[in-house]
Amino acid sequence: SLTNYDYRCIYDFYKKKIETKTTIDSQLDFLLQMYCHGSIEMTKSWVEKNMYLDIETLVNMLIESMPERLKQYINL
């Protein structure tokens, strides 16, 4: 499905960025998976339900929702 494809692309993108700075342990991988799934589901809801947010606000909220432990390895 498109959702699974998007998940894999986003997960792989962030995983590669993180791996340039550290080894991904199981806890960090859990946070990454949770963030990627959540981001995709919220974006999907935004499209399907015609949410009131403009795209810039949505992007900013997705960035803000990233766990601090991930942010330290990803330059946003």
Please state what every model-predicted region is.
Residues K16, C36-E41, S45-L76:
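C-terminal peripheral helix-coil segments that are non-catalytic and often amphipathic
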Residues S1-K21, S26-E41, K71:
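Amphipathic alpha-helical packing segments from all-alpha helical-bundle domains
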